[in-house]
Amino acid sequence: MTLETPVRVLIVDDSAVVRQMLTEILSRDAGIEVVGSAADPLLAREKIKRLNPDVITLDVEMPRMDGLVFLENLMRLRPTPVVMISSLTERGADTTLQALSLGAVDFVSKPKIDVARGLEGYAEEIVSKVKMAAKAKVSALHRPSAPKVTLDMQSAPMPGSALRFRTTDRLVAIGASAGGTEALRVVLEHMPADAPAVVMTQHLPASFSTAFAERLNRHSAMSVREATDGEAILPGHAYLPPGGQHLRIIRDGARWRCRIDDGPPVNRHKPAVDVLFRSVAANAGANAVGAILTGMGDDGARGLLEMLQAGAPTLVQDEASSVVWGMPGAAYKLGAAQEVVPLDRVAERLLALSAQAR
């Protein structure tokens, strides 16, 4: 596919209304061509072979074959960028997170009632995510995992007890978007139980945050949770903003606390990475480390620059391992990143930089 060629899209959804609405929404954009639609995965399988789409939109719950089973088979046999169409329910959130772990690039929320009007309200998001998916590197989601990071007392750069992170004076701040649900899992999976405290912002719908925190917690030696307003930030813990709210940090004497912020969207996002990073720059300065992982757009780039200017070491995920090198690329181009690191080394570098932080 070249830049001049429209993105070829196949729509897979058991609802005729949804198929029609998605066709209308996507066809309005000159850069997209809807080449076909299918009511279930079995029909879709034949159309994929015949139509060779660049992107597939896929409903999660469908007859004849579960959407997750279809997605898993697709990624194994014919990796293709997929944007999931998912319901804004707790069950839908968990299923969508499973889909992202299987290789879906991103998802769009589908309302349970008044679907036609609801999808129209997401038209801009649907178009932008389909176009982004066409450029995404599906293979980046299936890179082999590195072995879990352990602190080697002999090879680490600092002596003695400085390697143990049982203090409150180190903080890691991470931001991510498209592809980030899996990237964050990989990073946290390789952080030890006594790692410095981690504060994170991942672009997600409000109803997804609890399921996402629980999913990360199952994969990490750290304790991963949704932050509550005013709670102390502790080593060995990782904090996400609760649904649809910004996460900031504040200084309280010798420690930091979480501040939940219900202010307006920033960079069209709520939660926004820039909100978190700017608060970290102001309240933690050189005692923090900042990282931007895979994601679309430029949220977090300016905040990461503020962290760097405040004395914090900074890094971004490299393009080769990113599903979308939008946010990391924007930070790099802005001069906000001191290091560009493959995903399987991000945890290792965060630990090393935390040990060196002033």
Swiss-Prot record:
Active site residues per record: S177, H203, D299
Catalytic reaction(s) noted: [protein]-L-glutamate 5-O-methyl ester + H2O = L-glutamyl-[protein] + methanol + H(+); L-glutaminyl-[protein] + H2O = L-glutamyl-[protein] + NH4(+)
Response regulatory domain sequence ranges: 8-125
PROSITE patterns with a match to the protein in the record: CHEB, RESPONSE_REGULATORY
One matching Pfam family: CheB_methylest
Predominant place of localization: cytoplasm
GO MF entry, a single one: protein-glutamate methylesterase activity
Main enzyme class: hydrolase
A single cellular component GO annotation: cytoplasm
In-chain residues carrying the UniProt-annotated modification 4-aspartylphosphate: D59
Keywords: Chemotaxis, Cytoplasm, Hydrolase, Phosphoprotein
Domain annotation CheB-type methylesterase: ranges: 157-352
Highest taxon in the source lineage: Bacteria
UniProt modification remark: Phosphorylated by CheA. Phosphorylation of the N-terminal regulatory domain activates the methylesterase activity.
Compartment list: Cytoplasm
EC number annotated for this UniProt entry: 3.1.1.61, 3.5.1.44
One GO-annotated biological process of the protein: chemotaxis
Role description: Involved in chemotaxis. Part of a chemotaxis signal transduction system that modulates chemotaxis in response to various stimuli. Catalyzes the demethylation of specific methylglutamate residues introduced into the chemoreceptors (methyl-accepting chemotaxis proteins or MCP) by CheR. Also mediates the irreversible deamidation of specific glutamine residues to glutamic acid.
Domain text: Contains a C-terminal catalytic domain, and an N-terminal region which modulates catalytic activity.
Membership in a protein family: Belongs to the CheB family.
Official protein name in the record: Protein-glutamate methylesterase/protein-glutamine glutaminase 2
Source species of the chain: Xanthomonas oryzae pv. oryzae (strain KACC10331 / KXO85)
